[in-house]
């Protein structure tokens, strides 16, 4: 809780000291799926949640505090979760769907870094079209925006798709 408050205080300080219109969290992901990483903290918390849900609730609490800190100054707050909603939830412990639904963020910008025709091992579930549709289908609180995060670094480099890559042209 102290670390969460420290980060939220930092968000507030940025908003108070600098003429910013928004605060954007990028690559804030949970550092590992290894249960040992925070096992002692989890045990000490006495939580009745599973360790995975406890991790998600910690991230949710951080996001809520930071959103409140930014909004105190009229500053927008948002984040760029990984592009795959399921991976975001299960491997990054970030319940971005909840943030959209509850208005924990003013906007979400999923990292949709795959091409329109992305196919890997016969699976097109990570194509831009599939993932953009999955995010767009999630319920959003009034006023919460959804933006597509694009990976400009892919231009000329491709995305490893079995179907070729429109990033080359």
Regions found by a protein language model. Give the residues of each.
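Extracytoplasmic/secreted cell-surface and envelope-processing proteins
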Residues: 32-35, 87-89, 116-127, 156-165
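Short, proline-enriched alpha-helix->beta-strand connector loops that line the catalytic pocket
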Residues: 103-105, 144
């Amino acid at each position: 809780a102290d670390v969460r408050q420290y980060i939220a205080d930092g968000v507030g300080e940025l908003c108070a000291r600098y003429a910013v219109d928004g605060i954007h969290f990028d690559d804030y992901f949970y550092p590992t799926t290894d249960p040992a990483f925070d096992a002692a903290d989890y045990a000490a918390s006495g939580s009745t949640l599973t360790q995975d849900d406890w991790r998600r609730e910690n991230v949710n609490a951080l996001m809520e505090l930071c959103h409140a800190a930014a909004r105190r100054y009229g500053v927008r707050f948002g984040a760029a979760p990984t592009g795959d909603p399921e991976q975001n939830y299960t491997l990054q412990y970030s319940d971005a769907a909840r943030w959209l639904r509850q208005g924990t963020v003013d906007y979400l910008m999923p990292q949709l870094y795959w091409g329109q025709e992305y196919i890997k091992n016969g699976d097109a579930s990570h194509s831009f079209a599939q993932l953009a549709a999955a995010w767009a289908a999630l319920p959003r609180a009034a006023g919460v925006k959804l933006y597509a995060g694009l990976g400009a670094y892919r231009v000329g480099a491709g995305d490893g798709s079995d179907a070729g890559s429109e990033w080359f042209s």
